[in-house]
């Protein structure tokens, strides 16, 4: 094994900085009643305004809040939206996560599927961690420099495999809400 590692240029990571360490925590997110959350990573101060324009023009009836955390300069949480309660909930969520260059959107009267593609196509957006109404935990790493999101726990673990009856129920539901003919 050692020879393989040596031949393939794998080297053990030895950190000369004794202070370097990483703590992991799971932050439980309190999603407002009747809302979906979209949580993602972004990189530029105009994110909040661009995401506002995307949602407002894609789903005009949507109620939403948006917040974005800067990762340099004043490191402020920037917020936009058309519902003050959802804006405040986004700010509270990002304060509890504490990571830079993250955005949070709470969406009501619309589903994430309505806005995800335009959000992913926004030049500032680097990635989407989740789009869900399920119970949510955010896995956060903290170092001396700051915090970052490693991933999310979206909902619960699988309990089984879909049966024919489950499949029929799923298909009926999608037609009932207008997503299939």
Q: What spans do the regions from the language model cover?
A:
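Positively charged, polar, low-complexity stretches
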Residues: 71-95
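Charged/polar low-complexity intrinsically disordered segments
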Residues: 4-7
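Structural motif
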Residues: 35-38, 62-67, 76, 101-104, ...
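N-terminal, charge-rich interaction modules
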Residues: 20-79, 164-181
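Short, Lys/Arg-enriched N-terminal segments with co-localized hydrophobic residues
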Residues: 10-21
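Helix-rich interaction surfaces within compact, conserved domain-sized segments
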Residues: 93-99, 110-181
């Amino acid at each position: 094994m050692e020879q393989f590692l040596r031949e393939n240029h794998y080297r053990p990571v030895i950190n000369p900085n004794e202070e370097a360490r990483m703590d992991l925590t799971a932050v439980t997110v309190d999603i407002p009643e009747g809302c979906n959350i979209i949580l993602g990573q972004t990189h530029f101060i105009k994110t909040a305004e661009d995401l506002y324009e995307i949602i407002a023009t894609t789903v005009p009836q949507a109620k939403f809040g948006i917040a974005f955390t800067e990762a340099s300069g004043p490191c402020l949480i920037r917020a936009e939206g058309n519902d003050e309660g959802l804006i405040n909930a986004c700010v509270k969520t990002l304060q509890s996560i504490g990571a830079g260059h993250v955005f949070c959107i709470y969406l009501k009267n619309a589903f994430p599927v309505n806005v995800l593609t335009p959000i992913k196509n926004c030049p500032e957006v680097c990635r989407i961690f989740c789009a869900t109404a399920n119970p949510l935990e955010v896995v956060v790493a903290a170092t001396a420099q700051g915090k970052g999101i490693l991933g999310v726990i979206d909902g619960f673990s699988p309990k089984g495999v879909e049966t024919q009856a489950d499949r029929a129920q799923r298909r009926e539901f999608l037609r009932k809400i207008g997503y299939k003919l």
